[in-house]
Each structure stands twice: as C-alpha cells, then as structure tokens.
Amino acid sequence: MTDRPMETVADSNSSGSNLASPRSSTDSRTPSASVRSLRLSSHAPNHQHRQSISDTLRATPGSPRARRQPSLTQAAIQSLIDNPPAPNNANPAFVGRDWREISIGELVSPDDLKFVEINTGIEEATNILIDTGAPVLLIRESPQHKSAVGTFDYADLNAYLLLAAGLTQPNEELLASYEELARKAKEGIPIPLRDVKDLGRKEPLTTLPASASVMTAVQTFGGGVHRVVVVSERDDNEVLGIFSQFRLVKFLWENGRSFPVIDQLYPQSLHDLRIGSRDVISINGDRPLVDALQIMNEEGISSIAVVDSHFNVVGNISTTDVKLLTRSSSLPLLRNTCTHFISVILSNRGLEEGKDSFPVFHVNPGSTLAHTVAKVVATRSHRLWVTDPLSPSSSGPPTPSHSSVHIPLVTNSSPPPSPAVNNGTAAPAAYLSAPSIPASALPGARLSGRLVGVVSLTDILNLHARASGLSPADPAESRSRRRRSSSSSVGVRRSGEIGRELFSGRIV
C-alpha cells in the first residue's frame, strides 16, 4: 500500500532557461539576427552540419529505463502476490520447537493488561479505552483484586451508545435497570461499568492457564471464542495476560516455517480449502449509520460490509469506529449515511495517523490463504469480505488471485437481499440535509467486486485446528449461543426523555 517515488529524466533546460523555444528561434528572428547567424556560418564552415540547440531539443533521447526489460515476469509477480513471504521477524525462541510444546504464557505479557474497576464511570472507561489503544479493558472489583469479572470493549460502547440515543428496547426483565440508568442520568450521577457491561451480546469470559499449549488455543479459538484471559496455574484468580484470535493468527503467520502442518496450507486457495462463509451480512451505503450499529449489536459481529447498489464492497464499518461517535456533536452522524461515515473514518485516519491509503478489506475465492492472512495481519481486521472480481457490476480491477477462473462461493445468481432493518421514525430534516458522499467517490469503489462471502479469524483458526487433527466446536453454534444470550432486542423506537438525558453533553 505504499507508493515508490518515480524516477524521471529531466532536461536541464526544462526550467530557469533563457533559451528560446524552437518555435521562437525560427519564426521570431529579427533580420539582424539572421545576418549574424549567416556571418557565423561563413566563418565556421566545419560547423554547418552540427545540430542546432533547437534540433537537439526536438530530439531528446529517451530514458534508458524505457528500454529496460522487466526483471520479473507477470507470472512471477502474481506468484509473489499470492504467496507473500512471511515476515523476517520470526522469534528465534520458537525456531525448531514443536508448536504443541509452546505455551500461551510465553506469548502474553502483563504489560498488555489494562484494568478498570467495576465502579469506574463509563466516560472514564471510554477515555482509557481510546487513549491506551487497547482492544479491551478487563474489569475487576477493586485495585487490590487480581482477577477479572468482565470486559469492556468497543462492542459494549456501541451497545451503550444505542441505549443512550434511545434506540434500544430492553427485554422485559431489564426494564428496571433501564429506568435506573435514566434516573442516574437525570441526577448527574456517573454511570458505572457495573450497570452497562452486559448490555450487548458477548461471549462468556473464557480463561486458560498460562501452561496451556498453542494447540489448545487454536482449538478454543477455532470454535468461535475471540479472546481468552490467561491466568496463573498456582492461582486461577491471578490474571497474567489476555490472548486473542488476532495475536495467535499473527504469531502463526510470522513463525509459520516452524509449523509445517500449518505452513503447507498457505499456498492453497480459499476455494480449495473450503474456508469462509456464504452467510454474510452487509448494508447499503445509503442507509443510516444507526442501522449498521444496530445490526452489529444485534448480530454480535465486529464489522459490517458497506455495499453499493450493485453489491460491490465500498467500505467497512467496525465497532472500533464508534470511538468517533462519543460526543453529542457526533449525533447527526447517526442519521447520515454509512457512505458518509466511511469518509469520516478515512478523514480521521489521515488527520490522526497520517495515513492516506485505503485499507483493502476484501479477497476473492481464488486468493491464497497466505495472501488472505497477510492482509488480515496488515489491516488488523477480524474479517475479510470475499468478493467476485469478475462480476459484470464490478466497479474496478480484481484483487490479485492465484487463478483467473471464476469460482463463486454462492450458487444463486440473484443479488442477496439487503438486511431488513426497521427505519422507525423519519429522521429530522437537519439530518436529511447533511451532505451525502456517493459510493462511487470512495476509494474502495474502485477496488472491489460483488460481495459473495466472508472469511474470519475464526474460520482461519478452525482450519488450522482441523488440519492439526483437532476437533474444534462448530463456530455457528457459538454464534447461536451469543444470540440466545442477548440481553436486549433491537428496535429503533426512541425512548423519549431518557435518550435526551443521556445525550446531554458528551454521550459517555
């Protein structure tokens, strides 16, 4: 995603020269100038065949680079794209070791832990989450406690923002706690994490001892668990670290040569490995942002693909992006389009991180596992969208793939239906008048193809587990459990004064 500076061959007379152009040297000469040139010719007969400066400028020799033969053939370039070399920063501590003997305790550090107390206000917790850059905060009873009683991440923040905006209708058994939140908001009492940590769908807190092997982690993560809390063998109440799917995939990629059973999978295509899911959730770019937030909260997913009218992927919205919505001044964004919010995300990345590139969150069925994992690690994404680069409605060139043969993941030829989301009451006119960014104007609109599936970290680790002879749990069953354990049902019906009270000033 980086651009190399182009080398150019510049003429020394291209700027700052007092020489006349070829046209002015012939058409605008004065008679005296003609005489002088004739006199010079008569005194220098040996120079009559020498090229003039004008002739020299007309016939500037081409750059030697233009005649240079490519050092790599197209096939070699394609092979390099499909099978990117693993990073050279493999940890020498794991070279030559049987990966079944490597413990997860070797891969975590207490320095990575970020704790908050259960009575910490949600505003303070949100600031810590954003300022530290941690993907998750561990919740403990008090600073003296070494055990975790829960977690707080961007999915929880998303659930709270929906509640604060009055866009979540709680289940019957949660009405009392919902009213308590309203009372605290009206009285200006800080709302502690204790009251909001379980608002959204989340998996049970899973722990593993530090002595557990990497294979145990592969089997656990391959069954749909996204992160585990690593605890001491001597005291299972003492937290030593936190280990995630992403960290494990990154570790296996960087040290793949030490694990032949996994390394042999990388050159194979997603289609041949039968990896990925056809059950993909997307949202049209012209839908309100609040619809995307509700879908992620209801489905328990960390990101959602944004598509255009032809189902080409034009962008990606994740729960991490809700950090851009934590002030009341961000309220209009909820009613603006998903496409507009993507432009806000890109603008924020450029201002804060100095990045003007567009991260590519998609692959295609012919992409190799190596190409896919390298992209996952580079974008730090939990999911990549699988697109059909050869569809008639594609808006740009295909993502490089191992084969030019189109092997779709889906069998139906009709476009998949857009997620059904109740729009509820009409948005205020102020929101409707906000400028809208067309999907075709986004960088992603020129890169992708038609959305046909999704491949996640769970899919990759489930494949690794099965290739290693393990029997991981069915990820689909894990997703079903999260849905059944949902603490709220999504609705866009506003909750009157409660939403306005919670939305006064800063949301959190």
Curated annotation (Swiss-Prot):
Cytoplasm as UniProt keyword: yes
Entry-linked CDD domains: CBS_pair_SF
Keywords on record: CBS domain, Cytoplasm, Nucleus, Repeat
A biological process term (GO) from this entry: cellular response to glucose starvation
Region of interest (Disordered), ranges: 1-71, 389-422, 469-494
A single cellular component GO annotation: cytoplasm
Subcellular location: Cytoplasm; Nucleus
Record's compositionally biased regions (Low complexity): 20-34
Recorded GO MF terms: aspartic-type endopeptidase activity; protein serine/threonine phosphatase inhibitor activity
Family per record: Belongs to the SDS23 family.
Stated name of the protein: Protein sds23
Organism (species): Aspergillus niger (strain ATCC MYA-4892 / CBS 513.88 / FGSC A1513)
Lineage: Eukaryota, Fungi, Dikarya, Ascomycota, Pezizomycotina
Gene transcribed to yield this protein: sds23
